[in-house]
């Protein structure tokens, strides 16, 4: 279960890639803008302010996130990204930090490029950090007792779950798009006693939390804290630097 409040604890940090992505979308007066994986809707609102004459719609598979987005006045729909089909007047498709959770997203991108009208835009960014120390720590603790039984069938994601910019550029160019693709590694400055754990609790650890009892979850937290502290040490000034690689693609259908 995705918790909108936990996710929004780092809203400023999580929002920066969205703005970097949006800055490269050249749509002028779109009719319909769809935010796939809209989450709590705080960034979907930004789309409405940029394109006030467009019909802006959110789409998310989490009932909690959809409820939070609707609470902000967003036209949010509940559904899996894999099931989404663009309506004929869709001009802009945004997927911010969502497609890495969709195994077949490469096929979806090609399909959308074929369904959207010429001139339409597909813009997405995906987390490219599944080989980062934070994810290695998540998997290492999951292999320990007493967590192995509950987490034995976890769908762990490897580094190749997302492609390099050049892969997406080739994929969407072959699908008939003009493509701008790049990657950025952000160094987030975090504060607090367990800032990286607090960050991943809102994203990468959501499925782990679902599978563990309250007691087991607290034991898991205590087990992963020293691993994260070693990988992301707190500086003498109380700051922790958390590196996070992201891959960006902006494609216009031709």
Curated annotation (Swiss-Prot):
Q: Which InterPro entries match?
A: SAM-dependent_MTases_sf, Trans-aconitate_MeTrfase, Trans_acon_MeTrfase_C
* Domain of life, per lineage: Bacteria
Q: Which SUPFAM superfamilies does the record cross-reference, listed alphabetically?
A: S-adenosyl-L-methionine-dependent methyltransferases
The primary location reported for this protein is: cytoplasm
The record's Gene Ontology cellular component field reads: cytoplasm
GO biological process terms, semicolon-separated: methylation
- Which N-terminal stretch is annotated as signal sequence? none
Pfam families under this entry?
Methyltransf_23
Where is this protein localized, as stated in its record?
A: Cytoplasm
As one GO molecular function, the record gives: trans-aconitate 2-methyltransferase activity
Keyword set, alphabetical order: Cytoplasm, Methyltransferase, S-adenosyl-L-methionine, Transferase
What chemistry does it catalyse, as a reaction equation?
trans-aconitate + S-adenosyl-L-methionine = (E)-3-(methoxycarbonyl)pent-2-enedioate + S-adenosyl-L-homocysteine
Q: What does this protein do?
A: Catalyzes the S-adenosylmethionine monomethyl esterification of trans-aconitate.
* PANTHER family listed in its UniProt record: TRANS-ACONITATE 2-METHYLTRANSFERASE (PTHR43861:SF1), TRANS-ACONITATE 2-METHYLTRANSFERASE-RELATED (PTHR43861)
- Check the record and name the HAMAP family matching this protein: Tran_acon_Me_trans
Q: Give the UniProt family note.
A: Belongs to the methyltransferase superfamily. Tam family.
Q: What name does this protein carry?
A: Trans-aconitate 2-methyltransferase
What is the protein's species of origin? Mycolicibacterium vanbaalenii (strain DSM 7251 / JCM 13017 / BCRC 16820 / KCTC 9966 / NRRL B-24157 / PYR-1) (Mycobacterium vanbaalenii)
The protein's gene is named tam
């Amino acid at each position: 279960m995705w918790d909108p409040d936990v996710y929004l604890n780092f809203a400023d940090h999580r929002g920066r890639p969205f703005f970097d992505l949006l800055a490269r979308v050249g749509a002028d007066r779109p009719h319909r803008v769809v935010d796939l994986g809209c989450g709590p809707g705080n960034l979907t609102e930004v789309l409405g302010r940029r394109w006030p004459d467009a019909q802006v719609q959110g789409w998310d598979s989490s009932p909690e996130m959809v409820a939070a987005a609707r609470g902000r006045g967003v036209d949010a729909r509940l559904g899996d990204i894999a099931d989404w089909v663009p309506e004929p007047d869709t001009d802009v498709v945004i997927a911010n930090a969502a497609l890495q959770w969709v195994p077949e997203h490469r096929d979806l991108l090609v399909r959308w490029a074929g369904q959207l009208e010429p001139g339409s835009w597909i813009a997405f960014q995906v987390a490219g950090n599944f080989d980062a120390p934070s994810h290695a720590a998540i998997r290492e603790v999951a292999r320990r007792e007493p967590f192995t039984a509950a987490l034995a069938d976890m769908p762990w994601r490897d580094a190749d779950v997302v492609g390099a910019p050049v892969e997406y550029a080739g994929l969407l160019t072959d699908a008939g798009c003009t493509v701008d693709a790049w990657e950025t590694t952000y160094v987030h400055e975090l504060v607090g006693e367990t800032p990286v754990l607090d960050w991943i609790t809102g994203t990468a650890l959501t499925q782990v939390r679902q599978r563990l009892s309250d007691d087991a979850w607290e034991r898991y937290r205590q087990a992963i804290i020293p691993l994260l502290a070693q990988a992301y040490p707190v500086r003498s000034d109380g700051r922790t630097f958390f590196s996070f690689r992201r891959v960006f693609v902006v494609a216009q259908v031709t």
